[in-house]
Amino acid sequence: MAGATVTVEEVRKAQRATGPATVLAIGTATPANCVHQADYPDYYFRITKSEHMTDLKEKFKRMCDKSQIRKRYMHLTEEYLAENPNMCAYMAPSLDARQDIVVVEVPKLGKAAAQKAIKEWGQPKSKITHLVFCTTSGVDMPGADYQLTKMLGLRPSVNRLMMYQQGCFAGGTVLRVAKDLAENNRGARVLVVCSEITAVTFRGPSESHLDSMVGQALFGDGAAAVIVGADPDKRVECPLFQLVSASQTILPDSEGAIDGHLREVGLTFHLLKDVPGLISKNIERSLEEAFKPLGITDYNSIFWVAHPGGPAILDQVEAKVGLKKERMRATRHVLSEYGNMSSACVLFILDEMRKRSAEEGQATTGEGFDWGVLFGFGPGLTVETVVLHSVPITIAAITA
């Protein structure tokens, strides 16, 4: 019997990519139903039959006014909510009705974003080797990853990973996972999809649960998809951002700061007041660990993609690090135009940044800067930190 002619080390070397994981395309999608923030308090208290709670409505109006959100997109329409009054109550059994929506609509919205990313990528979908799907909106088996594989007509042998109930930091998580997949599997092309629908969290107001109302004032629906791969074929692929490093950490003394619990009443949301303070207090440590090896200490010399959990988080991070207002421009634009879409937000911000950089004639996809940071913040408190490197803007990037 002949023995092996190669070593394990040789096999491993052949399996690994040569260069870093790279974002090759981005696509986004929202439901058709658009809700303007200025009109939302009246709509919300009317549809939940809570107009008698006048003081609470005034509080909610102030929350919406301070949110820095102009509009959001929501799958839930007034007609659907009228047919499902338990979803409008504060704590009525309603999980079945919520699940019936998100199990169908989460992969469907993800498909719309994925199709845009695949079209921009310009390669046959048969070249997709891996699928990473992330949502905090409902749970099912087989999962949304399976449903999307069927919807898109991906190969049955595509390697799938389904990530449920991660929360708002997960836009960073999926990039970290995609980076590892792309760099450890030569030739891999990873389709990453984050799809979020607030049907699982929508509920009426309560005097005893004001942090739930914060969520009602902030959250919106959206899906984003990216194609990630290493060693791009420059003849047919157009790199956008390189994923240089990625890490995750739990912030000290932050247990219980952000919690979500899936119960018979849906997904309940709990938030401590000092979340912005906890994040800003620890942000410099994350930046130092990520950028000290690169010799970067001026955080105004990099581009920023930060999960817009709310304006207070962005304000306090800016103040703590001494950021110029324009560093968070793309982040604040996405917050204003879409609200907090949980895991999908940072991918929307990447899309906004590369498009605006091209439109303004910047030298790189990162607002003219070479290096950048992407932050995900969420339950735990968990922080994802991804170091990015932009690429020079080409004609292909401008016309994408």
UniProtKB/Swiss-Prot annotation:
Active site: C168
The protein's name: Chalcone synthase 7
Superkingdom to which the source organism belongs: Eukaryota
Pathway: Secondary metabolite biosynthesis; flavonoid biosynthesis
Pfam families per UniProt: Chal_sti_synt_C, Chal_sti_synt_N
Role this protein plays: The primary product of this enzyme is 4,2',4',6'-tetrahydroxychalcone (also termed naringenin-chalcone or chalcone) which can under specific conditions spontaneously isomerize into naringenin.
CDD domains in UniProt: CHS_like (cd00831)
Enzyme class: transferase
Gene this chain is encoded by: CHS7
A single GO molecular function term of this UniProt record: naringenin-chalcone synthase activity
Gene Ontology biological-process entries: flavonoid biosynthetic process
Catalytic reactions on record: (E)-4-coumaroyl-CoA + 3 malonyl-CoA + 3 H(+) = 2',4,4',6'-tetrahydroxychalcone + 3 CO2 + 4 CoA
Protein family per UniProt: Belongs to the thiolase-like superfamily. Chalcone/stilbene synthases family.
EC number: 2.3.1.74
Listed InterPro entries: Chalcone/stilbene_synt_C (IPR012328), Chalcone/stilbene_synt_N (IPR001099), Chalcone/stilbene_synthase_AS (IPR018088), Polyketide_synthase_type-III (IPR011141), Thiolase-like (IPR016039)
Assigned keywords, A-Z: Acyltransferase, Flavonoid biosynthesis, Transferase
Phylogenetic lineage: Eukaryota, Viridiplantae, Streptophyta, Embryophyta, Tracheophyta
